[in-house]
Amino acid sequence: MKCVEVYKELYHQEPFGIAFCPYRISPLGAHIDHQYGKINGLAIDKGIHMAYHPKQNGVVELQSLNFPKRAQFFVSAVPEEKQGDWADHLRGAAKMLGEKYRLKVGLSGIIEGSLPIGGLSSSASVIICFLSALCKVNGIHLEPMEMILTAKAAENQYVGVSCGKLDQSCEVLSKKNHLLYLDTKDDSYELIPTSEKMKPYKVAIFFSGLERSLKNSKYNLRQDECKAAAYALMGYAGMDYDTFANTRLRDVPVEVFEACLLYTSDAAD
């Protein structure tokens, strides 16, 4: 890990800890999780590593090997407004964790991603990796679902991405040689083991040459479009429905979908 090498060169000591969060792949889940659908996915052996040590003065100082500009802030006084850089994910994580727990200890170190940014949930991985280290130095233990929801809140409420919980769930709950099956409405999940009858396999991941960030994409617009569709379908069916913000495609019965598909098909003819 290059982050460990750089850490030793910079601080002239072994790191106090090395945090890791894997990237994820998802055969089924894009724009399904934020509509409270059922998804599946698995973690891979690539991800975010961070070599770090605690800082008793409560300051976070992190250098990324993937982005310019060092992150620096007090864990007890996170800026209310995002700054528009990669460290917003760290600030958001600290702010959400700090709303539930008293944070006194900061940390300093080096963070790196092992693959190009975008497409493998790198933003969620950064948040969870940082949260793991921040919890460690502050003596905080988060249960898996609490870690997932804290990381999700950091993206939703601070970074400004209206994501669901697909990425965080795959990264926290996945197990080697298993497929995660998750119902994002009630958070029930199952880890499905690889069948003994299944032939050995590998997952190929291709880099398109383009790097992206959800906060700079039309991701939030896509979610609003899904909500608008659900709102219209429920109104068409004469169903009782909640506010626009609390409407999801999961709330629409299958028979309503099928009836509307039949209607649109007839109209097209």
Q: What are these regions, as identified by a protein language model?
A:
Residues 263-269:
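Conserved small/polar residues in nucleotide/adenosyl-binding loops
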Residues 125-127:
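FabD-like malonyl-/acyl-CoA
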Residues 162-262:
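Acidic-enriched catalytic cores of C-N bond-cleaving enzymes acting on peptides and small amides
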Residues 1-121, 131-145, 149-159, 163, ...:
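ATP-binding N-lobe of GHMP and related small-molecule kinases
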Residues 97, 155, 230-234, 268:
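Generic helix-packing signal
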Residues 122, 166, 268:
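Single, functionally critical "micro-switch" positions that shape active/binding sites
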Residues 89, 129, 225, 264:
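Charged catalytic carboxylate motif
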